[in-house]
A protein has these predicted regions:
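Protein maturation boundaries and topogenic segments
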Residues: 1-84, 160-182
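Short, surface-exposed secondary-structure edge patches
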Residues: 45-49, 62-67, 90, 96, ...
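Beta-strand-rich cores of mature extracytoplasmic or soluble domains
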Residues: 132-182
């Protein structure tokens, strides 16, 4: 009997393709697991930054290695309610800070908050009409559309605990004309 000669070039090519496919699958899985949460913005509370129906990607990994910072746009479940839709708001104050809304403006630790976007004067200060001190795991959040937002000023949302934060909104995938980093 004759032994069939195996063409080593073909074997190497098959192995190379197999390794490339496996690496691609691992990268894709990692991306989807840590960063790939896609959600829709519901309502006008983040207008002009984000509009109702915008599709965004959420980085679920970043807050496992760092903490939210002022002006980060976060995605969270109100009061940890898993049956609720995701809320998208801007972080105004972080644990240990004090917050006060007075004469339509936001003060953090006695200083006027440095707004990164144009916002209207706040008509309803809610819970922040008196100085609030945030606990070790609490964040004060507001929508960019200050007078049309259900946020930390109201008892049904209140301060957001870190455990309720899903991640950081970082990329808009839809609509195409606004495609890009947030």
């Amino acid at each position: 009997r004759r032994k069939k000669k195996v063409n080593m070039t073909i074997v190497k090519e098959i192995l190379s393709w197999t390794v490339e496919i496996l690496v691609t699958l691992v990268i894709a899985f990692t991306f989807v697991y840590f960063i790939g949460l896609r959600t829709s913005v519901v309502g006008q509370s983040m207008s002009e930054t984000l509009e109702s129906g915008d599709e965004i990607l959420v980085n679920r990994f970043i807050y496992k290695v760092s903490d939210p910072k002022p002006n980060d746009i976060i995605v969270f479940l109100p009061n940890g309610n898993e049956k609720s839709h995701y809320y998208v708001k801007r972080v105004i104050a972080v644990p240990g800070d004090t917050v006060l809304i007075q004469n339509g403006a936001v003060y953090v630790n006695g200083e006027l908050f440095d707004e990164k976007v144009d916002v209207s004067a706040i008509e309803e200060a809610g819970l922040a009409s008196e100085e609030l001190k945030l606990e070790d795991d609490e964040y004060f959040v507001l929508g960019d559309n200050r007078n049309n937002s259900e946020d930390s000023r109201y008892a049904n949302i209140g301060n957001v605990k870190k455990d309720y934060i899903i991640g950081k909104a970082w990329f808009r995938v839809s609509p195409w004309k606004k495609f890009g980093f947030i």
